[in-house]
């Protein structure tokens, strides 16, 4: 079982949060 999909999802969520807090 690979954790890469989980890491990728977490990175996407973090990017969304940074984008929202920037606006």
Curated annotation (Swiss-Prot):
Major enzyme class: oxidoreductase
Catalytic activity: (S)-malate + NAD(+) = oxaloacetate + NADH + H(+)
Enzyme Commission numbers on file: 1.1.1.37
Family: Belongs to the LDH/MDH superfamily. MDH type 2 family.
Record-level Gene Ontology MF annotations: L-malate dehydrogenase (NAD+) activity
Keywords: NAD, Oxidoreductase, Tricarboxylic acid cycle
Protein name: Malate dehydrogenase
Gene Ontology biological process: tricarboxylic acid cycle
Role according to the record: Catalyzes the reversible oxidation of malate to oxaloacetate.
Lineage, broadest ranks: Bacteria, Bacillati, Actinomycetota, Thermoleophilia, Thermoleophilales
